[in-house]
Structure formats: C-alpha cells, structure tokens
Curated annotation (Swiss-Prot):
Gene3D superfamilies associated with the record: Ammonium transporter AmtB like domains
SUPFAM superfamilies for this protein: Ammonium transporter
Taxonomy of the source species: Eukaryota, Viridiplantae, Streptophyta, Embryophyta, Tracheophyta
Similarity comment: Belongs to the ammonia transporter channel (TC 1.A.11.2) family.
Protein name: Ammonium transporter 2 member 3
Bilayer topology term: Multi-pass membrane protein
Regions that span the bilayer: 32-52, 60-80, 136-156, 170-190, 199-219, 234-254, 270-290, 294-314, 318-338, 352-372, 408-428
GO cellular component: plasma membrane
Pfam families in alphabetical order: Ammonium_transp
Disulfide bond positions: none
Amino acid sequence: MASPTRPGPYMPRPPAVPEWLNTGDNGWQLAAATFVGLQSMPGLVVLYGSIVKKKWAVNSAFMALYAYASTLIVWVLVGFRMAFGDRLLPFWGKAGAALTEGFLVARASVPATAHYGKDGALESPRTEPFYPEASMVLFQFELAAITLVLLAGSLLGRMNIKAWMAFTPLWLLFSYTVCAFSLWGGGFLYQWGVIDYSGGYVIHLSSGIAGFTAAYWVGPRLKSDRERFSPNNILLMIAGGGLLWLGWAGFNGGAPYAPNITASIAVLNTNVSAAASLLTWTCLDVIFFGKPSVIGAVQGMMTGLVCITPGAGLVHTWAAILMGICGGSLPWFSMMILHKRSALLQKVDDTLAVFHTHAVAGLLGGFLTGLFALPDLTAVHTHIPGARGAFYGGGIAQVGKQIAGALFVVVWNVVATTVILLGVGLVVPLRMPDEQLKIGDDAAHGEEAYALWGDGERFDVTRHEGARGGAWGAAVVDEAMDHRLAGMGARGVTIQL
C-alpha cells in the first residue's frame, strides 16, 4: 500500500522541514520578533503620539513610523550582514543582501561568533540556531528598528522630517551595525567577553547617546514648547507603555535564539525588574513631590526594562529586583536632580529624556550585569570562556570589560551621529522653519491628530482643499470664516476631512 502523500507545508522536495529545523524554536523566534515589532508599532507610535503636546502628535508618531519602515528596507538590502555576517573589520561585518531564497532558507548562522584560543584552536563553534536565516533577519530587524524609534524620542517637536528621513538609514548603517557586530555578531567586544544579553549597550546606550548628541546638533524646541509640553492623552500613553512592557517578553525572551532556560529566566526577570523599578520611581515621586506621577511611573517602568536587558537571562531573580530598584532610583536622580544642576544637560533639549531612561539605565544595567552574571547561564548564552559576573569569579576584570565596552559604544555613537548630522545638514536643514515650529502638525504635514482643540492651537480650515469641496465643505469654510470675522477665531468649529 502506497504511503499517503504529505500535505504541502511538509513536502519533502524541497525540504519544507529540514532535519536541522526545530519547529518550536522557529515558532518562538517568529513570535518574539512579532512582540518586539508591537513594541515599536503601535507601542512607541502610540506612546509618542500621546505623550507630546497636541500640536506635535502626528509628527511624533510619524517619525517613529517612518523609522520602522525605512529600517526594514535598508536592513534586508545591506544592514543585516554588516551586523551579523562575515568579518570585514574587528568591529564591522561584510555588507551583503538578505534577499535570496538560497540565503534565507538556509540554517541561521552568525559566522564571526566562532571563538578561537590563543593557540588558534577552536574553543566554541559559531552560533547556529535551529531555524532558517529568514527568522534571524526578521528578529534582528525588529531590534534595529526599535533602536531608531527610541532615538527619535530625543528629537520630537523640531527636527525637519526630511532631515530625519535622510538620517535614519545612514545612522543604521554607520552606527548601529558597528555596535551590533562588535557585541553580538562576533566582533572584538564579543570575543573579548563583554556581556550584553539583549541590547543594554547595542540598543539602549546607543539610542540614548545618539539621541542626546543629535538633540545637541538639531537644537532645542521653541521656548514655549519647552516650558509647556504636557501630554495630550495620558491614557493612550499608558496603553503605549503597556505594549512596550509586554512586548519586552519577546525582546529579552528571543535573545538566546531558542526557547531555552535562559529565555524563561529572562522573561521572568524582565517583568520583575520593570515592576520593581516602577514602584521605586513612584515612591521617590511621592516622597519628594508629595504625589505619584503617571508619567513618572511609565518612565520608571521603562528604566527597569532597560536596566535588566543586558543581563536578563543571566542573573538570579533577586538580582533582577535589585537591578529594578537601581533602575528606578539612579535614572530618577539623574533626571530630577543632576539634570537641573548640569549646564550641558540643561542646554541640550532631549524631548523625552531618552538620555536618562535609556543611556543611564542601559549603562547601569551593563555595569550590574558585570557583577551579577551567573557562570552557567552566561556560558549557555555567550560561549566565551570565563565570562561571568565579578561576584561569581569574574573579578574586577569583567567589570572593566563592561565599562570599556560602554565607552566604545558612547564614543562611536557621538562621533558617528555628529558626522552624519553635519553631512545631512549640508543638504537639508536639520530644523523645521520657524512657521512650522509655531504651528506644528498642520504646517509640517497638513494634518492634525484631533478634531477638537482648546489650548490655544488653531486649525486653519482654509489650508485644506479637501474641506472646500461640495456644499458641506463650503458651509464649513463659511462658518469658520464667520467666526474669524467676528473676532472669535476658529475655536469650537469641528472639521472632519
């Protein structure tokens, strides 16, 4: 009797399920990538659009949305292999496309992660997960994209959108890929034993330092915006923050490239640290300001998530609580106390305080990972002999490596971001013109987030051709003009385009 024909998804030729493919691993990696994607879109898109002043809601959300889309195209064209391909330089991989079937359906591999001893003998093989390269490309894209989206938080409310469109692909290629290859792709920091489990340095320290540097070159918002920049929708801000928190399960849970024991520990530690940090930040707000702040709670949640990221799957859960407490207190101090006493921090207009929530928290997390990383779990993750926390035999050497790795990331991002922005500035202005800065979304995009307004911002219906068409549109325009002629302005007129 002939054996039954297997259904299409499991056809033997070509092998839809090769011997090396673990369907569980592949399913988890795709799910983790989706979780991280939801952090950016809609998570940070919603958070940015709601945490800013109403007149910048559309522009802020669009900056995040554009960064996400542009990153994907550049990533599959050249970026992925610059970060995770064959070694070109000690800090950079060879550029190449990730577009063809032959590459994408082959087993995932990070070739430069093979580690050799001083005698040239292979001590640990390259990283080779049990799923196709396409899954690796997708997951790493999501991490690259969220880095640029986080960076955008420093520049909201004044950067020329055309300059942002030019900046994002350049920064991805000449800054992000360097740090990613150096720490994750088998570059010199990886081989040296610097620990960055899921992006405390590659993503958060990079975005915080690059964002702060970019904010310096772009310049500050208008004085009126800096003095009064209250969120336009705190409830939506909480919703965006919630997506960010829950999506972090994929962020840190997908870092081992397998649903193994470190993935489970990472997801638990991530949530524990976030909760501890949120509570710590809230308590400090109550102690020093007499009342809890919802915005502060979201910032505390963020710093806890960032602080645990460099060591999420490598530390005890009690250490995750300590890291959460540190993540909720030291960035609070830098933002609330140090910021007011530093001339440089006062001068640079970092719109969403990305420097404090990501650079400070990421640096802190990397340092604490150098103290608390467990030998057994670190060996599972990095394959670099001797990589472990100072409290578990790593000594001061591991802490020194963590500090040196952070210094490299800081210096590279300052230099690369500066050079890129100065180059972009030769072609297109980095800042919006004064008229757009005063008006906001309507001048920058011809769109506004809400049909209702009442805080002094004005919707000029006569600028929109779509509102003039037909009898209904003409009536709306006439009504708006009547209000203006009566000296009442446009307030109270609801426009629906």
